[in-house]
Every structure is written in C-alpha cells, then in structure tokens.
Amino acid sequence: KIESMITFKKQSQDLPYLKFRKEYDRALYADQKIIEAISVSSFCKSNSIVDSRFVNLKIVDDTDFIFFSNYESPKSKQFMSHNQVCVTIFWNTTNVQIRMRADIEKTTKEFNNKYFSSRSPKKNALAISSNQSNRIDSYQSVEKRFKEAERTEDLNKCPKYWGGFVFRPYTFWSISDHLKGYL
C-alpha cells in the first residue's frame, strides 16, 4: 500500500479540485518523491521583493489547501502583510505542473491545537524548539534546544507562534502531457 503524504478530507466536486486529486494520485502511484513539496511565492511589502520557498502541503479540505509554519518566520510575516500568493507544484514522474494563485490566511487557533495534538511528540518538539529562518550558533545549540523541548515542554500544547496557513485558489492552472490549460 502506498501512503499518501497529504490528507484529503472533504473532496470538492469542482473540476480543478477533482483534477488536482487525479494528478496527485497519478504522481503518488508513479512513486513521486517529496510529493507534498509546494513552492509558495509571496510579496514582501517592506522591501518590495517577491520571495519563494518550499513548504509541505499537509491537508486538502474541500477548496482549502493547508500547510503549517512558525508564525514568526519571515514567510509568515509576508503572508500577513500581503495576503496573495502563487503556489507551484511540479511532479516530474508524471510531468505535471500545477500553478495556483490564491488568497492566504491563518487557520484558526482551534484547528491548530487539534492538528498539533495529533502529531508525533518528536515533530512537536522540533516545532517548539525551532527558530525558523533565524541564524543559529551551531548544530549543537539546535540539538540542545530540541532535547530540552522534549524534556521540559508539553508536547501536545500548540505554541502561539505555530500554526497553519490556508490558501484558496482563485486561479488554477495545470499542464501535463495529456491536458493543458486553465481549469
């Protein structure tokens, strides 16, 4: 059995979302590596530049696409200052590219708490101890913070600075060998 890296909840019956699921399943069964990796591009108002980074898409629920991050990270600050993003996915095993333009916002505190408590203690210790995108002194200091979090923190309690982002595409474009164009 092949394990899905993205949790699909309620499935929208609109064509773009059905197409996304079909292409995801094709890539999954073609053994796509790091299938959950998506590139999210955003605009930074403070210095007027566009920035991109890879994140792991975790949940697709109806028309909502959800990933998680440290709310104090530069990317999170960009999302909050300019709530539009462009998301790109490329699955090379099936030669499919998907691009979505979307509005983005934080998920609710209740949603974050529920999701966080469902994760493994090690993942939560990492989220608690990580100062995403900040300069580190050494690998040893990161490891020390992680071990300290494992030992001293409530690993089921979601920190205030951690949570999800949900984006809802308003433009959904897919290109592959067998289908090209806007959906």
Model regions and ranges:
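Short acidic, glycine-rich loop/turn motifs
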Residues: 42-47, 89-93, 176
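A short mixed-secondary-structure module that forms the rim of ligand-binding clefts
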Residues: 58-95
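Charged, gly/pro-rich active-site loop segments
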Residues: 2-11, 97-183
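An N-terminal domain-cap segment
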Residues: 8-62, 66
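Short His-Asn-centered micro-motif
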Residues: 41, 68-70, 168
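Generic beta-strand structural signal
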Residues: 36-38, 63, 83-87, 94-102, ...
